[in-house]
Amino acid sequence: MASTPTNLQKAIDLASKAAQEDKAGNYEEALQLYQHAVQYFLHVVKYEAQGDKAKQSIRAKCTEYLDRAEKLKEYLKKREKKPQKPVKEGQPAPADEKGNDSDGEGESDDPEKKKLQNQLQGAIVIERPNVKWSDVAGLEGAKEALKEAVILPIKFPHLFTGKRTPWRGILLFGPPGTGKSYLAKAVATEANNSTFFSISSSDLVSKWLGESEKLVKNLFQLARENKPSIIFIDEIDSLCGSRSENESEAARRIKTEFLVQMQGVGVDNDGILVLGATNIPWVLDSAIRRRFEKRIYIPLPEAHARAAMFKLHLGTTQNSLTEADFRDLGKKTEGYSGADISIIVRDALMQPVRKVQSATHFKKVRGPSRADPNNIVDDLLTPCSPGDPGAIEMTWMDVPGDKLLEPVVCMSDMLRSLSSTKPTVNEHDLLKLKKFTEDFGQEG
């Protein structure tokens, strides 16, 4: 092949001719010219272009020409089946190509868009999680901000007119296990008139070049079509970390598309809330951080919230704990997250089962029948110490299935589980989160 300027010039000439043929309506000729131009451009990128900026610029042009070539290819395929007026470059598509079919179904003619949107349909939460605001212990500041952004605009739309607009982006950040995703579940439950999209990086990252940013674009299009909508992105740092020279082209393009869709020129995001959650907010790109107008710190729970969590996690399970016991547990678990407390309670709930497994003696007691809880029987068996009056030497294997009465959960079970469960959050991470809150956030 000839020298660099000739190859690049040839690619530019071919692209220019393709655009002319496209405008003139010679679509078959234009398609071939676009394809040849892209081949030359890719050759220049691979073997000849110097510098990242030049390569990036050429790749962007290639994507543009390939998109147009795909549209022409689709149109030419359809034209073989039925003649119809083509879409000229730079002109809007006719009504039936935008999805307003004459048959009234409103289906999009673009198969690629349909495929991407079908891929994202799985992110829509159809069945509402049953988590109410009252199930979330503490975090009053975060709950109020979410009600202000989600519930009030739906219930009282007249409040949010003119310059008073609801928040479009809220970032929840804090140590792991403090209830960020749980709060999002509460939002999904309470905002029952909204479409809730729960997104992770695997929903948006594709191995195919250019498909990831199309998925991001289609996610926001789908949210606009189904508004009011909430887009919840868990672990957003995996998608929108700081831009650097070492990151891949694909990662940079995903970030750019997020920036454009969240707050770009000509983008209408009325009725759409983007809710992000992260444990490491300091790695977020500064432009992404700015688009989250409210940045709320979800801290480790305080003593009264921890006491309430012990109660919530015990639920209706029979136990002998008093209010004083719950307060005591709240004081003893300084530095524990909500997830840590959940693990302590789950382990404590297993203690009666372990007592049954290790028991060598059982005794007969009165209690509700397994078949009919309203009927009190006196032949149930419960574990006891060998010196207990009425103790019968036997193991749990000898106890009939419907005759076992397990011990209730008591304070000693809780303390035993607490002694074997350590907190998962370290002091170093907490200091970094507090520093980020001082610089950019607000307390939840």
UniProtKB/Swiss-Prot annotation:
One Gene Ontology MF term: protein homodimerization activity
Enzyme Commission number(s): 3.6.4.6
Binding site for ATP: G174, P175, P176, G177, T178, G179, K180, S181
Record-annotated membrane-spanning stretches: none
One GO cellular component, as annotated: cytosol
Gene3D superfamilies: 1.10.8.60, P-loop containing nucleotide triphosphate hydrolases, Phosphotransferase system, lactose/cellobiose-type IIA subunit
Keyword Zinc-finger set for record: no
PROSITE patterns: AAA
Broad enzyme group: hydrolase
MIT domain ranges (all copies): 4-82
Record's subcellular location: Late endosome membrane
Keyword hit for Nucleotide-binding: yes
GO biological process, one term: regulation of mitotic spindle assembly
InterPro entries in alphabetical order: AAA+_ATPase, AAA_lid_3, ATPase_AAA_core, ATPase_AAA_CS, MIT_dom, MIT_dom_sf, MT-severing_AAA_ATPase, P-loop_NTPase
Listed Pfam families: AAA, AAA_lid_3, MIT, Vps4_C
Coiled coil, from the record: 19-82
Post-translational modification Phosphoserine, affected residues: S102, S108
Topology in membrane: Peripheral membrane protein
Catalysed transformations (reactions): ATP + H2O = ADP + phosphate + H(+)
UniProt region (Disordered), positions on chain: 77-117
Similarity annotation: Belongs to the AAA ATPase family.
Subunit structure: Proposed to be monomeric or homodimeric in nucleotide-free form and to oligomerize upon binding to ATP to form two stacked hexameric or heptameric rings with a central pore through which ESCRT-III substrates are translocated in an ATP-dependent manner. Interacts with CHMP1A, CHMP1B, CHMP2A, CHMP2B, CHMP3, CHMP4A, CHMP4B, CHMP4C and CHMP6. Interacts with VPS4B; the interaction suggests a heteromeric assembly with VPS4B. Interacts with SPAST. Interacts with IST1. Interacts with VTA1.
Comment text on domains: The MIT domain serves as an adapter for ESCRT-III proteins. It forms an asymmetric three-helix bundle that binds amphipathic MIM (MIT interacting motif) helices along the groove between MIT helices 2 and 3 present in a subset of ESCRT-III proteins thus establishing the canonical MIM-MIT interaction. In an extended conformation along the groove between helices 1 and 3, also binds to a type-2 MIT interacting motif (MIM2).
Protein's name in the database: Vacuolar protein sorting-associated protein 4B
